[in-house]
Amino acid sequence: SHADLPLKTYQIVNTFRYETKQTRSFIRVREIHFFEAHTAHVDEADATRQIEEDLEIVENLMNELKLPVLVTKRPVWDTFPGAWYTIAIDVVMPDGRTLQVASVHHYRDQWARAFDVTYEDASGNQQYVHQTTYGMSERLLGAIVASHGDDKGLVMPPPVAPIQVVVIPIISKGDSSEVISESERITSELKSAGIRVRLDSRDIRPGQKYYDWEIKGVPLRMEIGPRDLANNSVMCARRTGGKQSHSVDHLVDTVRSELGTIGEEMKKQSSDHFNSRIKMLPAFTINGTDLIFDQAIEKGTVYEMAFDGNDAEAEMIEKGTDLSFLGDSTTAYKKKVPCVITGKPTTRRIFLAKPY
């Protein structure tokens, strides 16, 4: 019945494929974990609203993960089979290649007609439903690890870090009970405030503890020694770099501020990388079916261009650049720009890249 729509379902499934290409952890695997939403709607317009909601969710999630992304409507030849259109979300990896981490598909009523999926409308007539799919995979974890990690290990965005703060007591010779007691008190205070915190009271050197937690990517390390205790303070070390002493007064607010700063530093670093990898496609001349570029096509670069040509011309550009069409950016040019092939003014903004 129309009263049952929209119908929205969510599932986590694992699928297997005989992957013939080189496998890479999180990026190209034989067992794939999909996180999928499947929806059915009364008409095309309502399904389109669902697509818009999905893209808003993606934007919010990627903002939390501090990952700038390319959002493109895939070309016809790269659209999911049976879909009216596909919109994909790609992260630009450290080597300049792109990694698709999510996609949304609008099917209109094409699958409903194939499988006779109908509903009864308000007038009692049978109508075909309009369907969408929104999904992600563990490639998202690969993007986090590769984009934010450094030579020391992981760097986890504070909103998704399993442990946001690690408290490390610095034990010196003599009575350590006060340092331990204060470390436990601070841990309890942060935990009560909803901060994901861990007290590391292992009987090993502080340097080894630092090393362990840096590898795991914990955003904030908090050190408490006899000197800090005497000064009513703690030493905070950010995983993104930098140390600063803070008073234990209003410590919850201080920690939240530090985590916010870490997130902003991660966002700036990833945004700087993202922007540095995107360039305008160099000018070229056409010699038969070959493109002769004024400048060499750089490895590890995502190119953008204004394009309003046909499929054959798109294929010629792919061949000439040895790159793939990601598709039309969802953020088109505000003013019309000449197409790189035809010269016809267009607002279509196309991205070219070497995808994983």
Walk through the language-model features, giving the residues of each.
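NTP/phosphate- and nucleic-acid-binding module
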Residues: 1-356
